[in-house]
Amino acid sequence: RFIYFDELQKKIKKLPIKKLSIIPVIDRNTKRLIDVIDSEKLNLLDVRKKKQKLNVSVIIMAGGKGTRLLPYTSVLPKPLLPVNRKPTINHIIDRFGNYNVKNFFVTLNYKSEILKTYLKDLSKIRTIKTIEEKKPLGTAGSLFLIKNKIKNDFFLTNCDTIINENYNDMYKHHKTEKNDVTVVTARKKFKIPYGVCDVKENGFQMKEKPELKYYVNTGYYILSKNCLSVLKKLEYLDFNNFLLKCKKYKKKIGILKHLNNFLKVYNIRY
């Protein structure tokens, strides 16, 4: 018994919490294991509760070339590559749409005309504004073009990340912690397939195939509107350097350790 990733939100609601042991979550295309759901995680996902309206905007960074997905991105921009027969950007917009989020901004550069044509149809349902970079601005530089258009707090996401979580809970964490920027992380395990030698002044130690655990950046962020004040000019700016600017101006940066229930598009084999 298992659940396909694209059916997770729909089918998980019907799972009996008390009788649930372990349910694998499988990618439909590759048939690979993505996650495992148990009763504790099902409770944490909180998908049974009625979703409340989320009063935020969403910025989707869609200007990159998607070089890790060549040759497919030489034809289509990465946001339009399908995950289980549905463009990645639709997965992102639809998930926020479940929380009645209607205000979206999409930053464009590579193959922008294709994306603008596609998003024009989606704009009939939700308010989707496109912001075109005349030259690549990095993962945070285009925020300068939007800073005067944003009226409230917002989620910022890469266009290649799909997260199945309760966005209300994520935003509540951001507000409770009084963060200006919340970086959404996931716990990942990396097993080194070799013995690792540790040489120190007091001796030698070897660990056989150690497993390392880290909290990694998912590419999802929650930001308060006030943090955009650190952007003084239009420039190329990676998100790491944006965080350094936030620290310089005494903005509070925190992390959200989430359930690892996310998918990166570049992990998919077509």
Spans of features found by a protein language model:
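The conserved cystathionine-beta-synthase
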Residues: 2-21, 25-29, 43-47
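Short beta->alpha linker loops
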Residues: 3, 7, 21, 29, ...
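Short loop/turn microsegments at loop-to-beta-strand junctions
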Residues: 20-23, 194, 218
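Short hydrophobic beta-strand motif reused across regulatory alpha/beta modules
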Residues: 34-42
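N-terminal glycine-rich phosphate-binding loop and ensuing alpha1 helix
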Residues: 51-115
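Conserved N-terminal catalytic core of the sugar/cofactor nucleotidyltransferase
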Residues: 86-162, 169, 230-234
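Catalytic-core segments of class I nucleotidyltransferases/pyrophosphorylases
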Residues: 154-155, 162, 168-175, 188-192, ...
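A short, conserved acidic/glycine-rich loop-to-beta-strand motif
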Residues: 177-187
